[in-house]
């Protein structure tokens, strides 16, 4: 499996990525809600796995309970 994205990665920081959706910056991202997570995002490729690929972080994986500002509701 690919390595996990670190919250300290430059790309992760620019997107406000957190490994735990409950820790998202509510000041910077007021539209964030706790039911938003990588696992409910259209970009998440991990299906039901605890972690999976995301096209925004090439060569790395995100955790299912994570979140970033690019979150888009699964269709």
UniProtKB/Swiss-Prot annotation:
Signal peptide: none
GO molecular function annotations of the record: 4 iron, 4 sulfur cluster binding; electron transfer activity; metal ion binding
Protein keywords: 4Fe-4S, Electron transport, Iron, Iron-sulfur, Metal-binding, Transport
Superkingdom, taxonomy of origin: Bacteria
Sequence positions that bind [4Fe-4S] cluster: 38, 41, 54, 68
GO biological process, one term: aerobic electron transport chain
Record text on subunit structure and interactions: Homodimer. Monomer at different ionic strengths.
Protein's job: Specific class of high-redox-potential 4Fe-4S ferredoxins. Functions in anaerobic electron transport in most purple and in some other photosynthetic bacteria and in at least one genus (Paracoccus) of halophilic, denitrifying bacteria. Competent in photosynthetic electron transfer to oxidized cytochrome bc1 complex via the membrane-bound c-type tetraheme.
Family: Belongs to the high-potential iron-sulfur protein (HiPIP) family.
Protein name, as recorded: High-potential iron-sulfur protein
Organism: Rhodoferax fermentans
Gene coding for it: hip
